[in-house]
């Protein structure tokens, strides 16, 4: 017999019918293989049930504090990234950083001082670290808070 798509069949014994339990005294009737009485005979044990000991979700400590709804999360851009994206220098604003894909739109931007900057740039952002401001001004640029 050749191996063709219309000749494919499962191997003998590979597919067995589902055993229907609790349907008469023939096979797996009455108690359906669950034994007699007890929680396991009646329905099912809850997934997180630990046999009566204190469950893990109650043993673990509660989290302290609260989530501050007014917390401002800044997107950060380092000086080496600005140097890489704007090698000719010039004015760099939040819109320019969004256009180049350095940050996402709609979130405040903070410029951090990792790396070096070799060109004079006029950077306007929502916040600057002290190191970033020093390095930008040392390279002949300016910083403006938006």
From Swiss-Prot:
GO CC list: cytosolic large ribosomal subunit
Highest taxon listed in the record's lineage: Bacteria
Pfam families: Ribosomal_L27A (PF00828)
Family per similarity comment: Belongs to the universal ribosomal protein uL15 family.
Region (Disordered), start-end ranges: 1-39
An individual GO BP term: translation
Keyword line: Ribonucleoprotein, Ribosomal protein, RNA-binding, rRNA-binding
GO MF annotations, alphabetized: rRNA binding; structural constituent of ribosome
Subunit comment: Part of the 50S ribosomal subunit.
Name of the protein: Large ribosomal subunit protein uL15
Source organism of the structure: Nocardioides sp. (strain ATCC BAA-499 / JS614)
Matches recorded under PROSITE patterns: RIBOSOMAL_L15
Gene3D superfamilies given in the database record: 3.100.10.10
NCBIfam families the record matches: rplO_bact
Record's function text: Binds to the 23S rRNA.
Record PANTHER family: 50S RIBOSOMAL PROTEIN L15 (PTHR12934), LARGE RIBOSOMAL SUBUNIT PROTEIN UL15M (PTHR12934:SF11)
